[in-house]
Amino acid sequence: MKIAVLLVIVLTSALAFAQETSELAIPPNGDAERAEVSQWIGPVKISIAYHSPRVHNPATNDRTGHIWGELVHYGFVDEGFGLTQSAPWRAGANESTTITLSDDVKVDGKDLKAGTYALFLDLEKTGPSFWIFSRHQGWGSFQYDPKYDVLRVPTNSQDAPFTEFLTYGFDERRPDSATAFLRWEKKRFSLKIDVPNVSELYVAKIRQQLESWPGFRYEDWQTAAQFCADNKINLDEALIWADKAISGPFRGASVGHEDFSTLQTKAAVLDAMGREADADVVMQKAFTLPDANAVQIYIYAMHVLRSGKKDKAMRIFVLKQQKHPDDLTRICGCRTLARNLTTTSELALGSTDIDGCGPESGESLPYL
């Protein structure tokens, strides 16, 4: 009798394996369709590949209430086939569920190297369950061996809306983190993934890209420098990138492109480095360029104003009016000044005619 049962298990497993490894276009075993979901966290790509069984299986009908603890076993069990005598659930159906990470991440606060791992779930009846990251070369749980485990992290089941097909996804997305989850029937299991050095990873990829085709465009050098300035990282190299955008050779040209925009980026890098005086020198040059239009100067003045430097912003607004007295952004500039004039000296200055922005233009600044 034992021999007969073992033979059935072997034949069933062999048939399933043959179906899943065949290159023929045939339905998957057990109607568990292959599925894959990917999510980017900054420059890091995370992909989960799995087979998705359903609650209402065509062969066994409604399995609601019989998934967790029955179809999905608690703890570790002997699969009755393969090399292992004690294995967790494969967190899906048929082949092993796998998770692929393009870069190093943290999972539940623990380090996990880039690569592809088999993803198992140790379902516990009481207390936390555990996600297990292990080698991915096995099939299902049949070749599971704990000596190849790379990481185990706890997870608690949560009640969730009914989900017919076992589904992986991502939510709670942030620029440097996301939560992966498994949902099936009325349960959800989560997995927090963090990329703590996301800005540094961006810089590394940008640096690599600038050695290729993007390095032929001054705009990409400028974008790279601006990213570093905005995030206050890699500033010494960012200053080199900003200079290349201004004066570097591109596509046979002898110099880059010196205009208001590229000079403003260089000034932003210098400002992030704490070199405000040097940044001001660069912007003085930018203001004198023929292409320095009223909108560009106005936007820059607003940026300075938002940084809390009211006096400096006021001087830039005045400069804009001197350079472009007939520009339609005049009223916007006047109103912006008025809303931000708070001290007695500022009110005194605002009540005068600032190149067409005062009472003579119908804009009584202190009262707007």
Spans of model-derived segments:
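Boundary at the C-terminal end of the N-terminal hydrophobic targeting segment
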Residues: 16-20
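Positively charged n-region of N-terminal signal peptides that target proteins for export
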Residues: 1-5
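TPR/TPR-like (Sel1-like) alpha-helical repeat modules
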Residues: 246, 287-288, 318, 322, ...
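Early extracytoplasmic/domain-onset interaction patches
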Residues: 21-51, 57-58
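Extended, well-structured beta-strand/loop surface patches
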Residues: 49-114, 120-220
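Alpha-helical adaptor scaffolds
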Residues: 219-325, 329, 333
